[in-house]
Amino acid sequence: ELARAKVALRMRRDGEQYIQTLKSRGQSVAGLSERNEWDWYLEKNKLDLKKLDDKCWPAALKDLDKKQLKPIFSTDFVRQRAEIAWGRGKARVVVEAALDLGKVVAGDNQEEICELELELRQGDAAALLELAAELAADLPLMPCDISKAERGYRLFDPNSYEVDPPAQKLLAETPLDGAFAAIAWYLLGSSQRLAEQYRFNGHWRLLEDWLQHLQDLRTLLGSLGQAVPRASSRELREALDALLADWAPRIERGRDDETLRQQAPQLFRGELDETRWGLFSLNASRWLLA
């Protein structure tokens, strides 16, 4: 029930301190996430249900008997933190970088945790994406808004992970540039979640859907010259063309070749081990926010 309500309840140990955390999903677009979060510092490894009051507990779960709450997965990871600060024009930018390495375990299933979280402490959000893009140029970083809780739920129930982010409603009075941005964000966010889920389970249909979303995004970028000058999206289109040039023929051949379909997950992992996909995703986000 917590998963359906987009809520995660966690107990964490940090040294000798236990921390009870409640998280609820806020806005999430194309790998960039805003989450509501409450922390309580406790003396022992036991939920304090009194902390889960109306100030933080979702109304959708008001009838849930909190005494029945039981853990369904656990995470074991080490976090390393660093603060990065620099000047951007006349403004100061401060970002907290957290590297998490470990695993999430649900029953007999487990998945590796290897996450770099960048949190803007001070400055313009555009600076955060600039830093992420610089890192992604040298490291195989893949923007993804899946939380550790979602990873645990997915191990417990593989069908719990939603590959399509919520679509924004377009109205007749929506300006052309607003409609363009909404569609582009949806296609980009969906492609990222499809890539993550295909990496996880290797289901062929997800790879086909990933390609289709990228092809739709490429069509969108090339079709609205009046709303978006083509020169501004040239580098983005070239990067997307390179991705499509490699993957469209592979997927087309794989539709009629079982051997190629079986080889595709390993090829895709190879793609994710390079910088191309992550850098394209981040640069697309930067372009849409510009």
What positions do the PLM features span?
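Function-determining surface determinants
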Residues: 1-290
